[in-house]
Amino acid sequence: IFTASGDGDSKIYRLDLSDGSDKTPVAIDDDTNVTRITLTGDKKVVYSKTEYGSPMRNIYVDGKLISENADSDNITYLDGSFYYIKNTYGTDEEEPTSVLTINQDGKETAIKDDVSRYCVLDKDNITMICGMKYKDDFHGGTLYLYKDGKIVKIDEEVTSIETAVKRYDKIDLNYYSMQ
């Protein structure tokens, strides 16, 4: 349940009525002035909050912060792990930007930077396009495969990644916007 009010005092509650019994909503977060929210297949409440006009967001799961400065418009959830891109806009010149990150049990692991697009095939295989170039009528980059902890270059001048099999929750918090 998401409640919104004119004074910016929005709240998120969990209310599970699947067993048919009467229950009381449980507050998850009471400081969600600007948020985007969705539910995973295993009923985790995933939402994001922006901090004072920043283009990036902090991502929360069931009221717990799992990542700061992340792109909440493209999150994948598979077998208890979240996959997302961090630091797209880069606030520090020394820090890598657009870092594909896996969050498993609250621990973040950086996979590769300069990632524009990615697709989680399964927990051990991720395709990603890095180093996107935008020139004339061409928008493409280098395709890599992250397989069993190693990164392998596949091809260059790749424009998109397509998959026909959905084995995970694709979370687009922009699509499920509740602002």
How should these model regions be labeled?
Residues 1-3, 45-49, 82-86, 127-131, ...:
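Residue position within the beta-strands of beta-propeller blades
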Residues 16-21, 61-64, 103-106, 146-150:
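Short loop/turn segments that connect beta-strands within beta-propeller blades
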Residues 32-41, 70-79, 113-123, 158-171, ...:
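Repeated scaffold domains used in trafficking and secretory/extracellular systems
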Residues 70-74, 85-98, 111-122, 127-139:
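Intrinsically disordered, low-complexity segments enriched in Gly and acidic/Ser/Thr residues
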